[in-house]
Regions:
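Conserved phosphate-binding elements of NTP-dependent enzyme cores
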Residues: 1-925
Length: 925
């Protein structure tokens, strides 16, 4: 490689990196791979990105730097040739409740411009186009009539405050006007006596239709006068016609003056465009429909309205059901089948009761509850049904109603943002504009189309532009940031991405690779931390960090292209890519006669499907992104089972029933990627309850007994042994008022979390801080060496799930989503429980190398051997091929998904031509 075109790192020692030297070619797609914990992120993010960011900040003025703070130099000898660095991580950093997919990708900014520039306003009353008239419009109207036809140009006489009509007519006489018109009758002003109810118009000019320039010029001049005298309005009365043609220079139609489109009119972040009731949030604090009617499959007669239950409140239901049929309301119809008009009747109108002077409806019921909220039971009831429902004024669109009157291609901006991106592409591809509008919108449409295409390329065609950013998964958020980066068209930069393939089906990986190539071809260096085989094979250059994890990793075990791979390497990545190591297909598939059956699943995009989940098997739910996997498994299966076992949870997704062999299960556990603890002091050993044994071990040491230390002195969650200054955190948080809080190492304990006298207690030369700083692998060896088998055995599950590299005392806040999930799996493996439980995993292979996946599958086998059932949402083909039973949803994402494509063994799925999963699985079997 040419040194002048490379990024050169010498002696990198960040975290577990062992003084590594590495060259990264500029302007290439470089994949950094290796086992979990081998040092990939330490190299890519903590060294490369940290230095690129630091140098960029150093290049700014001292004034700008004061707002950015001091950035530490990564621990290495030197780094040369590094461009400005941009990190695109999996974290969902945007917690702003106003941020959406549209605003993040900037598509919405261009839509606002488009609607402000070429949007056409239509009257909601008649549907006619609202526009300002000009004198040229009068000329066009005249030319549409036959030559020689006579007509009059009139100005309506506006009412002047404090001035009578007679006085106004006298002023007209003084100005040189002589006649008014009543109907078609012309009357001299001095001869006219105003009568009540009459509306005369001022005669400006009388002409005959002619195509001559002289007539056109005269009409245009007279039209200017007519508009001025008529306060922006004028009339053309053809003598052969009864009704005059009305023209106005005001933006009005049907007697309503409309607001002219501007960018701010379509901004929900501006008071000019935001809905006045919800202030642009789309939701208000009020009575929540989902809480009032939790089961939408029930009819009103069967008790769909949850607050109309019990002896006293039930009277409302009884009275409603007795009277509503008179208004043709279907009281026996399931709530989800009611029309919007029928729902409005139930909520806002109801059957009218003469003696009360109001209707029986849900709104009236809660008015009664609010009127009685001085009583505790009514306050409790109000709190129970209060949530953040969709704003009834804007129906969740966030904009005021005037914005919805403006349309492009017959569609309002609120309709566009509710379309999936896949439909948005069709809309803009088929958008037909006239020559004038096309010229104005050319650049805007180019930007919109390129960003929409990019969203499709990264597999996000199922998202809508109004989807909130804080509801996206880490993988979705990262790919949206990738789209934003492409849109900004930066060149000569260093992009560092963290597993962009997360949450992506194999079908979409090829398109993601093309997006990465586009970013590279702009002139950027793209460094991707990745485990996906297709992306590794597509790389221009591969850097493998290893050979193992933690203290056994941190070396560069391979660098080069795919063509340079050679057998006999100590790199696990090379071994798997060359087929020297493989994840084997199971010799046989287990079967089961017991199922949990979901019937009529129709939450979100699910199309009323019936699905069976076999017990005591490894069941994988697959399908392209947005096909409905999480909705089926998390929203319906998990929540329904939680309710069945008497646990509180969110309302289960809509379905007809969840039944089957429920008695065969004793519980359900969702092993997700949320942090393992709410406190920054929580860590893997406290979560697995191993720390109790370690604390008791230290309390038994002679010095501890001599000083009177109990197990509590070795806890950083209680006073006694922990540092009094930092309360066992190891850091002090300094509030920076308007800036992010600053964390500084505690000066009292120097980050060791305990008092000096506690740290003097040692077990075979190690104090409690030294033990917490050990990796899981080192700790297992240490405790086995000194006969502490119980502690070593309890730590073993962490090693079994591929977490040998994490430190025992590592704060849960520093663990990735995938690591959190595997710590939870280790906890369940350590419990040795034989109560049959259904475990639900959502993409457990996140952040895992081929070799780690092999270990993970062995952990799954151990759970099944104990009589448990596993349901896994997964895209990874190595896990899918090992499933006993496969449920494939699709065929596409979003509206085109939500159907059961095929269910059965992997071999049966491969035989299904309609299954995308089957096509890619065929290569693995």
């Amino acid at each position: 490689m040419d040194d002048s075109k490379n990024i050169i790192i010498k002696g990198a020692r960040v975290n577990n990196l062992k003084n590594v030297d590495v060259e990264i070619p500029r302007g290439k797609l470089v994949v950094v791979t290796g086992l979990s914990g081998s040092g990939k992120s330490s190299l890519a993010f903590d060294t490369l990105y940290a230095e690129g960011q630091r140098r960029y900040v150093e290049s700014l003025s001292s004034y700008a730097r004061q707002f950015l703070g001091q950035m530490n130099k990564p621990e290495c000898d030197f780094i040369k040739g590094i461009p400005p660095a941009i990190a695109i991580e999996q974290k969902v950093n945007n917690r702003n409740p106003r941020s959406t997919v549209g605003t993040t990708t900037e598509i919405y900014e261009y839509l606002k411009l488009l609607y402000a520039r070429i949007g056409k306003t239509y009257s909601p009353i008649s549907g006619t186009l609202v526009k300002k008239d000009t004198p040229e419009d009068l000329l066009t109207c005249m030319n549409s009539h036959p030559e020689g036809e006579k007509f009059m140009l009139l100005a309506p006489i506006p009412k002047r405050k404090g001035r009578k009509l007679q006085e106004q007519l006298e002023i007209y006489l003084q100005q040189g006007f002589t006649r008014v018109v009543l109907g078609k009758e012309i009357v001299r002003i001095e001869d006219y006596t105003p009568q009540k109810g009459e509306t005369p118009a001022l005669l400006i000019d009388r002409l005959s239709v002619s195509r001559s320039n002289e007539t056109a010029s005269r009409l245009l001049d007279s039209a200017e006068t007519a508009f001025y005298e008529g306060n922006g309005e004028c009339l053309l009365q053809f003598l052969s016609e009864e009704q005059p043609y009305r023209f106005s220079i005001r933006f009005e139609a049907d007697g309503i003056e409309f607001e002219e489109p501007t960018e701010q009119m379509f901004s929900f972040n501006s008071p000019i465009g935001a809905c006045p009731d919800c202030e642009g949030f789309g939701r208000i604090v009020g009575i929540d429909e989902d809480l009032v009617i939790p089961n939408k499959s029930l009819s009103i007669y069967d008790g769909a309205v949850f607050c109309w239950r019990g002896d006293k409140m039930g009277e409302w239901k009884t009275e409603f059901c007795r009277r509503a049929p008179q208004d043709n309301f279907p009281i026996f119809e399931p709530y989800y089948n009611l029309t919007q008009e029928q729902k409005d009747y139930l909520w806002h109108k109801g059957p009218w009761i003469e003696e009360y002077g109001e209707g029986i409806c849900i709104d009236r019921f809660f008015d009664m509850v609010k009127a009685n909220q001085y009583k505790i039971q009514y306050r409790v009831m109000l709190a129970r049904y209060r949530g953040k429902p969709i704003c009834p004024t804007c129906h969740g669109t966030r904009l005021k109603k005037e914005a919805t009157y403006v349309k492009v291609g017959g569609t309002s901006i609120t309709e566009l943002v509710e379309m999936p991106v896949s439909r948005l592409k069709v809309f803009f591809d088929n958008l037909v504009l006239d020559e004038h509008d096309a010229a104005i919108a050319k650049r805007i449409l180019t930007e919109i189309r390129s960003r929409v295409d990019c969203l499709l390329d990264v597999g996000l065609g199922y998202l809508t532009l109004n989807r909130l950013s804080n509801t996206l998964s880490g993988g979705e958020s990262q790919r949206i940031n990738l789209v934003t980066s492409l849109g900004s068209a930066l060149v000569g930069s260093l992009y560092i991405l963290d597993e962009p393939s997360i949450g992506l089906h194999s079908r979409d990986t090829d398109r993601l690779i093309k997006v990465l190539y586009r970013l590279r071809d702009l002139g950027n260096t793209v460094v991707v931390v990745e485990h996906d085989e297709e992306i590794i094979r597509a790389a221009d250059y591969i850097i493998d960090v290893g050979p193992k994890a933690g203290s056994y990793g941190g070396n560069i075990v391979y660098r080069g292209n795919m063509s340079d791979l050679a057998p006999g390497s100590n790199s696990y990545t090379v071994k798997y890519l060359l087929g020297e190591e493989t994840i084997d297909v199971p010799a046989y598939r287990r079967t089961s006669n017991n199922y949990i059956t979901i019937k009529g699943a129709r939450e979100n995009n699910l199309k009323g499907i019936d699905v069976k989940f076999p017990l005591n098997l490894l069941t994988v739910v697959s399908g392209v992104s947005g096909s409905g996997k999480s909705t089926l498994v998390r929203n319906i299966l998990y929540r329904s089972l939680m309710r069945h076992f008497g646990n509180s949870c969110d309302t289960p997704g809509q379905c007809d029933s969840v039944d089957g062999a429920l008695k065969q299960l004793c519980g359900v556990e969702l092993v997700d990627q949320n942090p393992i603890g709410k406190s920054s002091r929580s860590n893997p050993v406290t979560y697995l309850k191993v720390y109790d044994d370690i604390r008791h071990l230290f309390a038994q040491q002679p010095l501890a007994k001599q000083l009177g230390f109990g197990a509590g002195h070795f806890s950083f969650n209680s006073d006694g042994g922990r540092c009094d200054e930092c309360k066992g955190e190891g850091t002090i948080t300094v509030s920076m008022q308007f800036m992010a809080d600053l964390k500084l190492e505690c000066e009292a304990c120097h980050g060791k979390r305990f008092k000096n006298e506690v740290l003097e207690v040692k077990y075979h030369g190690k104090n409690i801080y030294d033990i917490l700083e050990m990796t899981v692998g080192d700790a297992i060896n240490f405790f086995q060496e000194y006969g502490q088998k119980r502690i070593a055995e309890n730590l073993q599950p962490l090693q079994d799930v591929g977490l040998a590299y994490i430190k025992l005392g590592q704060s849960s806040s520093t663990l990735s989503g995938g690591e959190n999930q595997r710590v939870k799996l280790a906890y369940y493996l350590s419990r040795q429980s034989d109560r049959p439980t259904m475990f639900i995993f959502d993409e457990p292979t996140t952040g895992l190398h081929f070799h780690d996946i092999k270990k993970l599958l062995k952990s799954f086998e151990r759970l099944i051997a104990r009589g448990h059932s596993l349901v896994i949402i997964e895209h990874n083909m190595d896990v899918i091929k090992c499933a006993d039973y496969l449920i494939d949803l699709g065929p596409e994402g979003g509206e085109a998904g939500g159907q059961l494509v095929v269910a059965g063994t992997p071999e049966e799925v491969v035989a299904c031509e309609a299954s995308y999963t089957g096509k890619f699985l065929r290569e693995k079997l």
